[in-house]
Regions:
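Short alpha-helical elements
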Residues: 1-229
Length: 229
């Protein structure tokens, strides 16, 4: 389950007898009920986002969700027809699975996410990711560098900032280190999701199970941004 110590549901159930509530719901029954309540978890997450104070800035990025070791990329059959092979530039790694695209505030609150096959380019998901976004300034990495995308987003009321490549005119002036540092905070959030919730590893074998896991992790992550009285 999503906790700083327990990232395995099996491990959680193995110590269930330590809780004062006594007998826990049987695992398969718990999972069936949880999947039936995906809509509720999603509703709570979106309602929480509406409660956030207005902010001008948000950050977009993606991370890999591999389903097997690279050596099995061309033999994997899990999620056949849905997952595929993609390349992760930051890790210099080809992987089979999905890609998770996220929209995050500067403070680290996850506003939205989209899961796609691994081969889908980041630019293809931007409009879906920004659906309902109240932030007007969007920071992205070189994967979002596109004059056409920038122009189209400006017509939608968004200002997209990405760094320039080093060989581009005006790159040294444009690539302000303060803005670059703000953009990199999303990488810190991804590291936290991996460390606390093991988000890059999943044993689920169904789309409903994958969606439930993502919704649970994001909800647990976002809850800490609200003062619980």
């Amino acid at each position: 389950m999503a906790s700083p110590i327990l990232t395995s549901q099996r491990h959680f159930y193995s110590i269930g007898h330590l809780f004062p509530c006594g007998q826990l719901l049987e695992r398969s029954r718990f999972n069936r009920r949880s999947k039936q309540l995906i809509w509720l978890v999603q509703f709570i997450r979106k309602a929480m986002s509406e409660m956030l104070p207005s902010d001008k800035l948000a950050i977009i990025d993606s991370f890999p969700l591999p389903l097997c070791q690279p050596v099995r990329n061309h033999r994997a059959s899990i999620f056949k027809g849905l997952a595929d092979i993609g390349y992760n530039a930051s890790k210099h790694l080809w992987f089979y699975g999905f890609k998770v695209h996220m929209l995050v505030t500067l403070s680290g609150y996850i506003l939205n996410y989209v899961v796609t096959p691994a081969s889908v380019h980041d630019i293809k998901v931007v409009y879906e990711l920004l659906e309902g976004c109240k932030q007007s300034v969007i920071l992205g990495d070189l994967g979002y560098l596109s004059s056409e995308l920038k122009k189209d987003l400006e017509q939608e009321g968004y200002h997209l900032w990405t760094p320039f490549r080093k060989n581009m005119t005006g790159a040294e002036e444009h690539n302000n280190w303060k803005v670059m540092a703000m953009r990199r905070t999303i990488e810190t959030r991804f590291s936290e999701l991996c460390r606390l919730f093991d988000i890059e590893h999943t044993l689920t074998r169904s789309l409903a199970g994958l969606q439930l896991r993502m919704e649970q992790i994001i909800l647990a992550h976002n809850l800490r941004y609200f003062e619980m009285n």
